[in-house]
């Protein structure tokens, strides 16, 4: 499928048949055409290109690696080079720096590179400012012929007294290391024994994707709270039994405390590093075991280089099982699909290693998100509003942000390749808007409205649009979908034409699908080429496909919505 894209010649650090075979293998099984083109544009170079692409690679607990893990990690590092990405190793501060440097030296050499151990990664001038070795040694690091891979030790050289010291603030060290350097770093990988940032929503498995600009503060607060709770060592009650319980579990609590401290530091480092790299840079935290996987389809590092995303989508429901039974009291119909939640990626064999998708978190610096909860659009909360929708009464307070209807319409027109009749559209939705979500500079939007009976409305996703040039990048679709289901967890509905190429994506994220041409009873049937999709609480008897009367309300109101396109 991708051979024609490679026909112009692939120039990477180790150009050979193995490299092409590796790339074709992964692209054929995982990547879209857009992702393949993006990869080839970013990581293949012409003969006169002076830029080398690098990844920062931090491996924790190196001194505990077993021989087979060293061998498998060596294979992964070699593949990084084949794919056009040269590693820069960073050693975390510990008592085992010399041993860890020795192991990295072996890995680098066996992977076909020339290791270069660098003692003082930072220099502190007399005025207290820092200079990164990534800047001062840029000419060597970017030399194509030398094939040098630096191994950076966590020491700082202090000009004031011509001394060196081991950093006592690794997060600050990483921040200064990446600040203002000329070395092109596109990825930051952290490998450890505990995996990515834990998520309560995923049964303590790792977050799949983190948009740092949106989620960092909340995640840091949660992790800090867990650390403080473990440090406090408070028994459940003051009874002797519970105090004894605490004492007997001291070792386990210590282990858990250290793990959460590590998670917290990993998150903080990811934030400061990505803040100093380009907006397109990606971070990833996973286990050493996953990163050492020989399967390119399951190795999160290899997969991310080729697709710039996580192994699974972050907006997929965690639990889903398909059933083909209609609700009680209705006639069987092939056009009805109902689903209930079942543990997705369920770990049946607890002794086997966890799936890489469960222990990997992908990070982006993130993009701006604005959520407008204006039921009605007026000239006071929007720009480019048609005159007929202006109101006389001014609000008591003016909103800080306004919806730009010109940009909103432009995005919808480009995304759907049709022209939206804004006046017709506003006549239908104005006054019934549940929320409008805007990503970046109108790179993505979701318009949600209140539909159905006045006394019992439901939330309907009326428009979901992503800028064509941004599709597949920055996980915008996943970000919007996650925001919607968190904001409206009980009921969220939308419709899509039967031949829409996005229907597979919709189907995977819904818990119910209904063909809107179905007979709703009493002769209530209309020809329709739309499917209805439902997301909501699976155990609720008041909402969703468990309630036949409510299901009919969904179907009738959504089926009968008239589109607002120019003819």
UniProtKB/Swiss-Prot annotation:
Protein name per UniProt: Amino-acid acetyltransferase, mitochondrial
Organism of derivation: Vanderwaltozyma polyspora (strain ATCC 22028 / DSM 70294 / BCRC 21397 / CBS 2163 / NBRC 10782 / NRRL Y-8283 / UCD 57-17)
Main location (coarse class): mitochondrion
Recorded metabolic or biological pathway in which this protein acts: Amino-acid biosynthesis; L-arginine biosynthesis; N(2)-acetyl-L-ornithine from L-glutamate: step 1/4
Alphabetized PROSITE patterns for the sequence: GNAT_NAGS (PS51731)
Cystine residue pairs: none
Keyword Transmembrane on entry: no
The protein's Enzyme Commission number: 2.3.1.1
Reaction catalysed by this enzyme: L-glutamate + acetyl-CoA = N-acetyl-L-glutamate + CoA + H(+)
Subcellular location, record wording: Mitochondrion
Gene that produces this protein: ARG2
Pfam families named in the record: NAT
GO molecular function term, any single one: L-glutamate N-acetyltransferase activity
